[in-house]
C-alpha cells in the first residue's frame, strides 16, 4: 500500500506538471512550447536538489521513528523545516537573478529566449513553497503516512490545471501564465502539508514554537540530504550538455525534444516512488534491528521499479505519436519528437538498477561513495560522450544513446558497492552480544 500510494503521488505530480506544457503547447503555439521546454533542465536541476534534500530528511526521520527515538524525531522535524526553507529561498534568488546567464550558457535559440527567461523567473517564485511541500511529504512518507500528501497534491494539481487554462486561454498570459499557475499551486500544497503536520498527535508533529536548528541534527540532515541533492543535480548538470547538443540543431528539433522529454519525467518519477519506498523501508528496518527485511525491501523495490519502467516505456514506444499530440498539433514537431521516443522507449527500465541500488545504499546510511560513482558514471561519462561520440556523428540518436549507456555503466558500479556496503552493515546483527556480568 505504501508503494502504491507513493507511485500514485509521483505519477500525479508529473501529470499535473505536464499540464503546463500541454496547455501552452496546444493553446499558445510551438514557440511557447519550445520556450518552456528550454527551461526544463534548470527546473529539473533545482527541484531535483530539493527532492534529494528531502530524501535525506525522509531517511533520518524513518530511522529514528523505527528505533523509537522520539526526541531525535522531534529535533529532525524542527531543524529540517529551517534547512528546507533556506534551500528554497536560495534557489529562488538564483532563479530570479541568474536566469538570463543560465539560458545563455545553453545557447538557447533567440526566438525561444525571451519566453524562457520569463518562465524561469515566475516559476522560481514558488521554490520556497516547493521546498516546504517536499519537507512535509518526506516526513509523512517516513512514518508510512502517504495518503495525506497525495490528497494535498490532488487539490493543488487540479488547481494548477484550472489556473493554467484560465491564465493562458482567458488572460492570454501564455508562458507567464503556466509558470504563475505552478507557483500558486505549490504554495497551496505547502500550506496544506504544513497545516497537517501541526495537527498530528505524535513525535513528528510540527510546533512552530519549537522550530530551531539543532547543530548535530542539522549536520546529519545535510550529511544525508546534500549528497542526495547533489546526485540529482549532477544528472541535470550533465543534461545541460545534452540540451546544448539539442540546441545545436534547428528550432524544430528543440520543440520536438521539449514535447518528448515530458515522458522522461512521467516515467522516471513513477519509478522514483519505489526508490523512496526502498530507502525508507530499509532505513526503518535497519533502525528497528530487522536485517531479514532489509534485503527483501531492496529486491521488491527493484522488481517494481523495473516493471514500471518497462511497461510505461514500452507503451510510450507504441503510442508515441498519440502522446506527443497532447503537446502540439504540428506534425513536423511530432516527427522530431519521435526520434527521441524511438531511442528512449525501452531504455528507462535500465535506470532502475542504478537508482534503486543508490537508494538502498542511502537507506543504510552510505551516501558519499554512491554519489562519487554517479558523478563519474553519469556526469563525467556523459560529458565525454557529448564531446567525442556525439561530436563525431552529430546525429540525434548518437546523442540520446548516452542515456542507456551511462545508466548501465553506473548501475554495475553501484551494485558492486552495495554488495560490499550491505555485508558490512549486516555485521552488527551477527556479532555476538557481550555476556552479562
What do these predicted ranges mean?
Residues 3-58, 226-246:
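Signature of the first transmembrane helix
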Residues 45, 160-164, 190-194, 266-269, ...:
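Hydrophobic transmembrane alpha-helices of multi-pass small-molecule transporters
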Residues 3-4, 61-126, 170-226, 282-347, ...:
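Short alpha-helical transmembrane segments in multi-pass integral membrane proteins
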Residues 15-34, 103-110, 166-173, 233-266, ...:
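Helix-terminus/linker motif at the lipid-water interface of multi-pass membrane proteins
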Residues 28-41, 116, 120, 179, ...:
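Small-residue hotspots at the loop-to-helix junctions and early N-terminal turns
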Residues 54, 123-141, 149-157, 178-193, ...:
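Short runs within selected transmembrane alpha-helices of multi-pass transporters and secretion channels
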Residues 33-93, 130-149, 243, 256-314, ...:
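Small-residue-rich hydrophobic transmembrane alpha-helices
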Residues 8-20, 122, 156, 185-189, ...:
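Transmembrane helical elements of multi-pass membrane transporters/channels
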